Each structure stands twice: as C-alpha cells, then as structure tokens.
Curated annotation (Swiss-Prot):
Belongs to the HisA/HisF family. InterPro entries: Aldolase_TIM, His_biosynth, HisA_bact_arch, Isoase_HisA-like, Isoase_HisA-like_bact, RibuloseP-bd_barrel. Its EC number is 5.3.1.16. GO terms for molecular function: 1-(5-phosphoribosyl)-5-[(5-phosphoribosylamino)methylideneamino]imidazole-4-carboxamide isomerase activity. One of its GO terms (cellular component) is cytoplasm. The gene is hisA. This is 1-(5-phosphoribosyl)-5-[(5-phosphoribosylamino)methylideneamino] imidazole-4-carboxamide isomerase.
Length: 261
C-alpha cells in the first residue's frame, strides 16, 4: 500500500485542520516547500498537496507555493483544492503536477469531468469525495451534496474516472483512528481504485487498511499523524523542529512518473 504524506496550504503556510474546520488550524511550517523536502527525504514516493484557500474561494491562491514544491521534488505530486475549471487543470499539469484532484466540481459540474477525460489521461484526473455520514461535502466542506458518496462515485465511473480519493470527514485530523467501516463500505459499492484519507493515527490503522486492498483500496493519504510524529523513523522532522535545518540532497532514487496510478 502506497503511503502518501499530505501538505495543506493556507495563507502560504503548511497547516493542518481538524475535521476541515478553518477555525481549528495549526501551523506547522511557514514554508510548505520545506515540509515537502522533509517528507521526500523520509522516502515518500508521492505527495498530496491541497490549497485550502482555493477550496473556499475557487481561486488558486497558493499556486506559486505549489509550483515551488513540484520544481523541487523528484516524485509525483497530486494537487487538490478549488480546481473547478479546465484552465485550472491545464495550469497545474503545465507546471509538472502529476495528477489533479477534482472535488466540488464533480458534484456541481460533472460535464467538466467528461471534458477533462476527453483530453487528459485518467491517471491525471481523479475525483475526491469527502463524505460525512455517507454524504459528500463540497466547497471546503461547507455544503452538502444531494446524493450518497457511492452514488457520486458510480456517476464518475460512468464518465471514465478510474480512481477516487475518499475522505471520512468525521475522522479527518481527529487522531482517533481511520474510518475503516466507512471506507470499506464505500470501496465495496464503488468498485474502483480508492485512495483512503482521514484519521490514520498509527501503523495499526495502515494494517487495517491493507485488508481492504481486495476492494481496490491501494493507497492512503496521511496527514496529522506524520506531523505529530506518530510513526517511527521521523528523525528529520524532529531535527527540523529543533532548529537543525534540512538540505535538498535526496538520498533515494527519483521516482517521478514511476508511481503506480
């Protein structure tokens, strides 16, 4: 199972939210690029980057910050948050982003998904479904969809979408364990490749998710647990917190473009 570290950007800084609540945010670093380097040096094979400001406003506020991350790293970077037009997707792919995550627009403008898949590879276009009690939430989790999460997935599947990033909002940032049952239910009904997200707290959660590989769950996005050093071998992050700094010399081979999509 591929483990994908998450970097959320708000006001140009690397932050983490609790259950998507913008009033409950913690700033970890002023420069998201430094955070990206840390995760790369800890052997990340891919990064998940979200522009939180764009998720609310629909404007690519942190585009330059994301460009810096992509230009610095030698691994695939997927980007989400406020991507609501064909031009947004072109712009991100144009700077080397490996794949873009369409969230709200999949609900409000499904025709956009069809247009994107007519132009780009399904490996470059994925749909993010962030659900609470089985109901997708959109526009920075401030509005609800009228359909069930798996129903949305099946509609996307008809359009040619191959992968869903599924987030259990009730677990996101809570450090209370992964939403195993909700993810299992969704994956079984959707019948697609699924990247799980939300609530991973320990290696035990990762082991539980591995049992869902038979249903298409082949990767997981991990956020706050990494920032709170809940996993072993996180010496680099510890060193950075202590002011010891980092460098940009990667000790592992480049895997840009080689990640399994």
């Amino acid at each position: 199972m591929l483990i994908i570290p998450a970097i959320d950007i708000k006001d140009g800084k690397c932050v983490r939210l609790t259950r998507g609540d913008f009033d409950q945010q913690k700033i970890y670093l002023d420069n998201p690029r430094d955070m990206a380097i840390i995760w790369r040096k800890q052997n990340a094979k891919m990064l998940h980057v979200v522009d939180l400001d764009a998720a609310l406003t629909g404007t690519m506020v942190n585009f330059e910050k994301i460009r810096e991350i992509v230009a610095t790293l030698d691994i695939p970077v997927q980007v989400g948050g406020g991507i609501r037009s064909f031009e947004d997707v072109e712009r991100y792919l144009g700077i080397g982003v490996s794949r873009v995550v369409i969230g709200s627009a999949a609900v409000t403008n499904p025709q956009l998904i069809a247009e994107l898949l007519a132009t780009f590879s399904p490996s470059q276009i994925v749909v993010g479904i962030d659900a609470e009690n089985g109901i997708p939430k959109i526009k920075g989790w401030t509005e609800s969809s009228s359909m069930q999460d798996y129903e949305l997935a099946l509609e996307m599947k008809k359009l040619g979408v191959k992968r869903i990033i599924y987030t259990d909002i009730s677990r996101d940032g809570m450090m209370q364990g992964v939403g195993y049952e909700s993810t299992r239910r969704f994956a079984m009904k959707a019948g697609m490749r699924v990247t799980a997200s939300g609530g991973v707290t320990s290696s035990d959660d990762l082991k539980k998710l591995q049992t869902l590989e038979q249903y298409g769950v082949d990767s997981v996005i991990v956020g706050k647990a990494l920032y709170e050093s809940n996993f072993p071998c996180q010496q680099l992050w510890y060193n950075y917190e202590k002011g010891m700094g980092i460098d940009c010399n990667f000790t592992t081979a480049s895997v840009r473009g080689k990640c399994c999509f």
